[in-house]
Structure formats: C-alpha cells, structure tokens
Amino acid sequence: MTFTTQVWALLGLSSALAHAASYRTVGSSGCAAQMVFVPPYTDTVVFLDNYHRNFGGPGVNLQTGAHSPHPFMQDDDSGLFVFGVEYEWRTNNLRKLTPKSNTFCAAGAFMPDGTMVNVAGAELYSGDANTKHLQDGRQTVRRYAPGPCEIDGCTMDFDVNVDELQSRRWYPTSITMTNGDVLVVGGSDVGLLVTNEASINNPTYEFIKADGSKAPPQRNLTILEFGAEDNQNADMSFNLYPILQLIPNAEGADHIFTLAGNRANVYNYGTDEVYKDLPDIPGGPRTFPGSAAAALLPLGIGGYEPTILVCGGSSGDIPNPKALPDCYRIRPNDENPIWEEDDALPNGGQTMIEPVQLPDGTIVMMNGAHKGCAGGYQAENPAMQALIYDPYKPKGQRFTKSATSEVPRMYHSVAILLPTGEVLVAGSNPDVFYNPVGKVTLANKKYPLFGNNGHTSYLHQQQSPQSAYPTEYRVEIYSPPYMDHAASRPFITAYPVSVKYNEKFQIAAQGAREDVVVRLSYSGFHTHGIDMGARMVQLEAVLSPDGDDMIDVTSPFNPTIMPPGVYMLWVIEKGIPSEAVWMKLEL
C-alpha cells in the first residue's frame, strides 16, 4: 500500500463553485457529446461523437448556442472533422483527439489500470463529410490510457485496433468483470437504424482480456435472441444497449444483472449460464429505443445487498411509443425477486434520462424528453428540470425537484460526475449528423415516416415540425444541493494511492469529525442514457482513535462489490462530500 499526501486536487476551485442546485454554462464541447468518460488521474473528460461535420470548436456562442463560424478540423492533412475531444473542465480548454474509426454509438469500460476500452461503432457514411481517411468502427477497439497528462504538449490519444472484436457491433454494452477483463454484449451488425431486426441482430458476447491474451470465442446469449416474427415486438427487438450490472456475491462470481427489452435475468458470464431467471419488468421494454434510466443503488456496508432501480423510458406502443413515468426496483439476490413499483417520476413520463450517482448517496436524473422515445427525431418536449432521487427516504418521499436548465438535452446527450462532486452536462443532437437548425425534414413529404435498415420504420417521428433541436455544443455544470456547503466540505490530505481487497487503510481528512462516510465511485461510460458500469460503494469506516483527522477504512471484500480499477474516493461528513481523489483497487 502506497501512501500519498494530497496536494493537487483542490486548487482553490471551491471558491468558484455556484450556489446549490443550479446549472451554469461553462464552455463548448468541441464535438457533439454523444459519449463521455472521465480518464483517471486527470482534470478532463473525453467527448466522442459519430463522424460528421463539426462547428463546435472555438467561437461557439455560450449564451445563444450559435455554432462557431469555423469548421473544427484535424490539424493534419486528412481533411477530417474533429469527432473526439479532451475537455479540461477547470479551464474549459479543448484538445483534439483522433479515434480514427467511426465511434457512432460505441460502448466503453475501464481496464484495471484505468485505461478506457472504447469498443465498436458504425460503418462509414460518406454523404455527410469526407471519410477517405476514416475506418469502419464496428469491430474496433480503441484504448485511451489514464493520466496524468498535461494539456500543453500532451500527446495522449487513442490506440486503435480496427479488427479486434470478433463480430460487428453497433449499440453494444460493456462493463468490467471481476478479473478486470472487459465484457462486450450484444448490438447490431448494421448501423443507421433505430430498431433492431433479427437479420442483423448480434445476440452474442465476448471478452477483451486485461492481460492482453487471446480471448475465447464469442458466445451466444439467449436473452438477446428473437426471430423475424418478432421484429415489431418491442419487448424483444428493443434490445440494443442492454442494461448490465455486476451483482455482489460472496462467491466472487461474474453474476451480472442483464435487462434486454422487458426480459431480465442474472447471468454468469464467467461460466456461460443463467444463474437466476427474473420476472419481466412491467410496462414494456426499457432498453434502446425504450431507453430507461437504470442504476445499481448505492451499495452499503453489511453485505452489500444490491437493488436495481429502473425509471421511465418508453413503451412498446407502435408506431408512437409513449414516455413512461413509472419506476421499479428489484433485489436480484432475493430468493424470489420481484419488481416493486417505486415512486413515479414527478414531472410525468420521461425517456432518455441520465441517472448520475452522487457521493452523498442520492441519484440525480436529468436530460431526455417527456414525449416519444430515443432515436433520431423520435422525441418531443425536452425535460429541463433535474430530479434528485434519495433511496434512503421512505416510499412516497424519494423524489425532489431540483434546478432547471435552459438548454434542451434530447437524443445524444450525456451527464457525468466530476471529482468536484458536480455533474458535467453536454450534448444533444436528434439529427444524428450535423444540423444547425434541428428540424424534421418535410421536403420529401414522408414525415412522420423514416428509414430503418433499408426500408420504412414501423415507428414514427414524434418531433413536431415546428420544433428545433439543433446540434448542441454548450457544456453545463450542474451543482447539487450539497454544494451550497462547499466552504465547509472535508478536505482529503493523505490517502493510499492503491489498496487490495479486504485491506485496512487510513485516510486523513480535515473537517471530518462526525457522521463520516467514505465511498468509492465509478462514473462509468455514459451514452444514450445508459451509464455502463457506474456504481457507488460505501466502505466500512470509523474515525480513528489516532486522532489527527484520521479515518480507519476497510476496502471491499471482493471484486463483485467493485471490480479492479481506479476510482474516485470520497469522504462525506453530514452529507457534504469532499472533492474526490483517485485510488486504485487491485487484485
């Protein structure tokens, strides 16, 4: 166990923080932020988009959202527009990245050393922008190493292997396994569609090995399978971006909660078998384009019993899915698990919600729309108000309405937790490609019809012809209510940079004197309202008899609680979190 003194993470930022429960616009994202992750040991996030024209560089009007008059291009002679950006959230500086292959609707998870593994994507679409120097992304693996990396002179970028995946995948899901391998599940082998179809469905899963060795052959996954007769059965075909969560268990097994359409189970991906069948979730499909918010509720000490929360999304009504207001919880480790109805969303039906786990144990839900479903111009009535869900409160009191944004965050928007305890919010691009206006196309007189896999979709566009949701480049910061007490927050002054499982260690934190909680968090990979692998874990912790602001802490007892990786470590006193520091959890 290596011990370090915290000298770099605060840098006086607290004095500049906004008042509680507020949004503020801070910068431009550099590309339409369809995907986002936080590289460990850095003050940055990485934004990714699919490839198309881009006017999101310097010159974006942060008040009106008007785009830059200048195209944002790569600095080489490739003629490519920028579609990957490292965004420094303390200074709002941009650094161009080169993903090299089409990242459209990709997935991602971290290796144990903090390397992001960004997988899959789409074929090339030459109609929108020059793709001469771009590669097909469907079987691609892109690795992005952890920091630190100085913005000035930094050369960190994606290491790209175009044919590493065993099959083509568009809209898969990835999470980290107990041994540090990355699991890749599902998808379609053709892009530019909204609903999956049996002829292009990819009902399999595969691994990317943490040690670099050759992965075993991909395996079939029954929960993703359906025939042509079910192409218009939303409970079956709404199965893209399946919801996955690693479930704590004493055996250390890779038991993973899996939800696809309305079907759910706990699957052992290590032994390739169903561990436990679960009942179908009520109300219809909850995965893309149903796109519900799903979260593993914060894990507490004393057994780490898991509860999965699923809120909102869209129904399977054809041709116009309805945004759903309901929330359900399930405890998959129960002997006979059932879906229990929870408090409903207070502002009515909402789809494409981003659920972000906060260090105080609450979950903020934001973005999306109150009408329609995910996918292109499929939605209307943007959800502008953030909601805070408190799992510790009694049923009937769990939701609180929070701050309201002035920026619509529709399809292809994101939100992610920063080490400051605030939430970065970006993106929105219903057109999918670059569109400075954001209106549905009426010239071909086909509205509300649109194409899907070479033919007319059985769904309708639900965005009104009068509405406009252009490609959005503005970046906001959402300040949760606890930031009103930022001046009195704890301050981590010393901590171990790495620990092993079930290891006792100490943290020094100024201002942590009573009602102290210590948590580890994983922000995951965020896209399309799905937060791949995100989790918040409370650690056993007591104030040390040694004094001097010391806290005695015990790490998780096995990697089903938190897989090996680099995580944000928080100290919370009376509900007020410190800024986070980075700590590695090792096998």
Predicted features, each with a name:
Residues 19-25, 90-100, 144-166, 185, ...:
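Blade-edge beta-strand/turn elements of extracellular beta-propeller
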Residues 79-90, 131-152, 197-213, 263-268, ...:
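Beta-propeller blade signature
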Residues 409-489, 568-572, 577, 581:
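Blade-level signature of beta-propeller repeat domains, shared across WD40, Kelch, NHL, RCC1
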Residues 25-33, 483-516, 581-587:
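Beta-strand/beta-sandwich contexts
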Residues 19-25, 37-99, 119-150, 226-373:
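Beta-propeller domains
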Residues 47-60, 82-88, 503-582:
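Immunoglobulin-like IPT/TIG beta-sandwich domains and homologous Ig-like subdomains
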Residues 32-37, 49, 73, 82, ...:
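Beta-propeller and closely related beta-sheet repeat lectin domains
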